[in-house]
From Swiss-Prot:
Physiological role: Catalyzes the cyclization of GTP to (8S)-3',8-cyclo-7,8-dihydroguanosine 5'-triphosphate.
Binding site for [4Fe-4S] cluster 2: C245, C248, C262
Stated name of the protein: Probable GTP 3',8-cyclase
SMART domains noted in UniProt: Elp3
Listed PROSITE patterns: RADICAL_SAM
HAMAP family per UniProt: MoaA_A
This protein's pathway: Cofactor biosynthesis; molybdopterin biosynthesis
Gene field: moaA
Top-level EC class as recorded in UniProt: lyase
């Protein structure tokens, strides 16, 4: 499906829970400010089933921390049984060592691990948890079982800026495929922490100089730099960036049962909780959810637009 701004809808991003075992001071919480109402596995899979009718073929599972859901493996298996080409997950990696193999068997295709520091001290300052070594073990387990490409997310801020290039070195040594250097943006807890925002321009300019190839990714038109080692460095700058918004191809299912058309906005969401919890047959629910998707696509628009 194409929205009225010519943007294809290809990706469903599902928040499985707001609960997390870390306390990162900048967490954007997927732009959600509602209660931690947890949709059932059946609710999630029903929405995903309807989304397939709109040519959505990719699902990203997020949180909070998705590995805290006891039915995570079953959800992944259900999504693959629906025929999704790509099922991936973003995790803090704390429980990944124990879950990686089970998730791979269930059909998880690839994984993003949030790693915002390269030292135990900085890691604890950012997350509130002394778990750097445990997360590294989780990353190694993901690589070993074949959850590839393994991508590492690094939110750049004033507390970890000096570790960026050592982070690139660590990533190369670990054998990961790709890293994302992400701008801190004022969403969720990031609103309170935006004073820690750090401009990525100088970092990106240096990475471009040492790279052997520059690519532009279709999603969000993100710049990607291939280093001589083969590591891909993707720079993600969503805030006040109309180019980023012009390439957005996703819709979100919030933890409290809303179709959310933009990370930054709460004024153009479609509440589908009553449909999911209503006493309707599954056929009727599918029809009503289909209508909800149509409305969501109709009202979907870039938050940051080009000024003409």
């Amino acid at each position: 499906m194409i929205d009225r701004f010519g943007r294809p809808l290809e990706d469903l991003r599902i928040t499985l829970t707001h609960v997390c075992n870390f306390e990162c001071f900048f967490c954007h919480m997927e732009g959600e400010e509602g209660d931690n109402y947890i949709l059932s596995k059946e609710d999630i899979l029903l929405v995903a089933k309807v989304a397939k009718n709109f040519d959505i073929n990719s699902v990203k599972l997020t949180g909070g921390e998705p590995t805290l859901r006891r039915d995570l493996v079953e959800i992944v298996r259900g999504l693959k049984q629906l025929g999704y080409r790509d099922v991936s997950m973003t995790t803090n990696g704390f429980l990944l060592k124990d879950l990686a193999y089970k998730l791979k068997l269930a059909g998880l295709d690839r994984i993003n691990v949030s790693l915002h520091a390269i030292s135990r001290e900085t890691f604890k300052k950012i997350t509130g948890v002394d778990a750097f070594d445990r997360v590294i073990e989780g990353i190694k387990s993901a690589i070993d079982v074949g959850l590839v490409p393994v991508k590492l997310n690094f939110v750049v801020n004033r507390r970890n800026r000096e570790e960026v290039f050592k982070f690139i070195e660590l990533s190369q040594n670990l054998g990961v495929n790709e890293i994302h250097l992400i701008e801190l943006h004022p969403v969720g807890l990031g609103k309170l922490a935006f004073k820690e925002h750090d401009d990525l321009r100088e970092i990106e300019e240096y990475i471009e100089k040492i790279s052997i190839k520059k690519q532009i990714r279709k999603k969000h038109f993100r710049p990607r730099y291939v280093l001589p080692s083969g590591l891909i460095v993707e720079v993600i700058k969503p805030y006040a960036n109309p180019i980023f918004c012009a390439g957005c191809n996703r819709i979100r299912l919030s933890v409290d049962g809303k179709l959310k058309t933009c990370l930054y906005r709460e004024d153009n969401v479609i509440d589908i909780l009553d449909i999911l919890k209503g006493e309707y047959s599954e056929d009727v629910k599918e029809e009503l959810l289909g209508r909800a998707f149509m409305i969501a696509i109709a009202i979907r628009e870039p938050n940051f637009k080009y000024k003409i």
